[in-house]
Curated annotation (Swiss-Prot):
Binding site for XMP: 312, 481, 536, 542
Disruption phenotype: Growth in minimal medium is dependent on the supplementation of guanine, addition of guanine however does not fully restore growth and the production of virulence factors is affected; in rich medium in contrast, growth is not restored by addition of guanine. Avirulent in a murine inhalation model of crypotococcosis. Avirulent in C.elegans when grown together on a lawn of minimal nematode growth medium but not when grown on brain heart infusion or minimal nematode growth medium supplemented with guanine.
Nucleotide-binding keyword on record: yes
Oligomeric and partner information: Homodimer. Also forms a small population of homotetramers.
GO MF annotation terms: ATP binding; GMP synthase (glutamine-hydrolyzing) activity; GMP synthase activity
UniProt protein name: GMP synthase [glutamine-hydrolyzing]
Function per UniProt: Catalyzes the conversion of xanthine monophosphate (XMP) to GMP in the presence of glutamine and ATP through an adenyl-XMP intermediate.
Length: 544
């Protein structure tokens, strides 16, 4: 959904990100409250926004607010006339702007803390904790993660919560809807934190809680129909993953047979993927699907390339080229139909569907100060600048769990909705080194065994994503009486709510043992299996 359109349909909370590892959780908590919100870098100029938020939340940050390179908010934030909530660093930024003092404290607070809410007796000042049930001792358990803290109140601010070591844990302006909390209400370790956020967005900001997948479907279908008109045609990039499948189903619901689902076999798909996807989309969903075998073209362009960013760019650019060529064929067919049927004919092919999600957008933002781009996502930063087709991305504002919920509402079978994600660049970013047919075959076989064993153990639906990575190293092994010198694969499985953070999955030892045994015995060229136990952060889900 386009930015201007979505803000005309939903009240929006703006989250300004200062580089905190928890920033995305603020977004998640708002969405869980059926409140639409959007995260932008802290460097965002308010004057450049084409819409006005109902409220603004300033995130935490790894920086000290007085450090020479510390990020700072646009001063216009405080003249916009909307409620503001500062979290951790956000509180300190509010204090800095309004004349308070922030210092490094001798007692750093990391972990659980108990705050005492201070009632001022004034409704607006007490609004942040209004109606929240305190614990038996009268306090409220929260999660702290800060070294600096507010040591003197800015003029016209009052204390609304404190701890023994932090007298200004939460503050409020005397007459304006500006609040700050030193703790992190967005994390699960603050049990009542979601209620604090709810008090701000609903009670203080007055946001209408209309954001839900039930409301999203008719509005997005109406938007798609308006964009495409009565005759416009769309080609859809589908891979068989949940994102593109849900996007394709939504598009098919909106414009019917004017939507053309196209799958590009780029040579770096999972084993027998093209056949499986064709069956799933045509039999289960009734979508008209064309499969284009462009594997020779992709592999020729990937020859000799090891750098993951170059792989992404090559695959993204080649992907668009193939789609444009197919669009030209469809356009020629449309022109022929127009000549034969006149006004009964369909319109031009103008749009390219992609299943871009909100985490893709977040991770592809390059902040000028506190953060750096993690990687260029295939769906966001790897497209041709001179692309002739226009992108249509109906899922761009959604998190993965929202997409799955949307799929279920669209009556997509559970075995499709629950499928693990697969990256746009495919196995090319799971092969750490040059992509060759031999390496692809090894990885396809190992990955197929891995997923088969996970399903057999009844663990597939407990895992958010699982895959095998082929490493660019060899190890000595023994097969019978012979010495081997073959490749190493890493198996990875993670659990996550939204793919912004993830924990490695704890397998029963016997399952890992069987996975390792089967791969080393059945996959020629592999003699060692390792298990990746890295969480996100510090790692990413994919290796490249």
């Amino acid at each position: 959904m386009a930015t201007e359109e979505i803000h005309s349909l939903y009240d929006t909370i703006l989250i300004l990100d200062f580089g905190s590892q928890y920033s995305h959780l603020i977004t998640r908590r708002c969405r869980e409250l059926n409140v639409y919100c959007e995260m932008l870098p802290c460097t965002q100029k308010i004057s450049e926004l084409s819409w006005k938020p109902k409220g603004i939340i300033l995130s935490g940050s790894p920086y000290s607010v007085y450090a020479p390179d510390a990020p700072h908010v646009d001063p216009d934030v405080f003249t916009l006339g909307v409620p503001i909530l500062g979290i951790c660093y956000g509180l300190q930024e509010i204090a800095r702007v309004h004349g308070g003092t922030v210092d490094a404290h001798t007692h750093r607070e990391y972990g659980y803390a108990k705050i005492e809410v201070v009632k001022t007796g004034k409704k607006d000042q007490d609004a942040l904790f209004e109606g929240i049930e305190m614990e038996a001792d009268g306090g409220l358990q929260v999660w702290m993660s800060h070294g600096d803290q507010l040591t003197s109140l800015p003029p016209n601010f009052v204390t609304i919560a404190s701890t023994p070591t932090s007298p200004f844990t939460s503050v409020a302006h005397e007459s304006k809807p500006i609040y700050g909390v030193q703790f992190h209400p967005e994390v699960s370790h603050s049990p009542r934190g979601k209620e604090v956020i709810a008090a701000f967005v609903k009670n203080v900001c007055g946001v209408r809680d209309g954001w839900s997948m039930e409301s999203f479907i008719p509005k997005e279908i109406a938007r798609i129909r308006q964009i495409c008109g009565e005759k416009g045609q769309v080609i859809g990039a589908v891979s068989g993953g949940v994102d593109s499948t849900v996007a394709a189903k939504l598009m098919h619901e909106a414009i019917g047979d004017r939507f053309h689902a196209i799958m590009v076999d780029n040579g770096v798909l999972r084993k027998d993927e093209a056949k499986k996807v064709h069956k799933m989309l045509t039999v289960d969903l009734g979508v008209n699907l064309t499969v284009i075998d462009a594997s020779e073209l992709f592999l020729a362009r990937l020859k000799g390339v090891e750098d993951p960013e170059r792989k992404r760019k090559i695959i993204g650019n080649t992907f668009i080229e193939v789609f444009e060529a197919e669009a030209a064929k469809l356009e020629a067919a449309a022109e022929k139909e127009l000549a034969e049927k006149g006004g009964e004919a369909k319109g031009k092919i103008e749009w390219l569907l992609q299943g871009t999600l909100y985490p893709d957008v977040i991770e592809s933002i390059s902040f000028k100060g506190p953060s750096a781009t993690i990687k260029t996502h295939h769906n966001v930063g790897g497209l041709l600048e001179d692309m002739k087709l226009k992108l249509i991305e109906p899922l761009r504002e959604l998190f993965k769990d929202e997409v799955r919920a949307l799929g279920r509402l669209l009556n997509i079978p559970e075995h499709l909705v629950g499928r693990h994600p697969f990256p746009g660049p495919g196995l090319a970013i799971r092969i750490l080194g040059e992509v060759t047919r031999e390496q692809i075959a090894i990885l396809q076989h190992a990955d197929d065994i891995y997923i088969e064993e996970i399903r057999a153990a009844g663990l597939y639906d407990q895992i958010s994503q699982a895959f095998v990575a082929l490493l660019p190293v060899k190890a000595v092994g023994v097969a019978g009486d012979a010495r081997t010198y073959d490749q190493v694969v890493a198996v990875r499985a993670v659990s996550t709510e939204d793919f912004m953070t993830a924990d490695w999955f704890v397998f029963p030892p016997q399952v890992l043992k069987r996975i390792s045994s089967r791969i080393t015995n059945e996959v020629k060229g592999v003699n060692r299996v390792v298990y990746d136990i890295t969480s996100k952060p510090p790692g990413t889900v994919e290796w490249l």
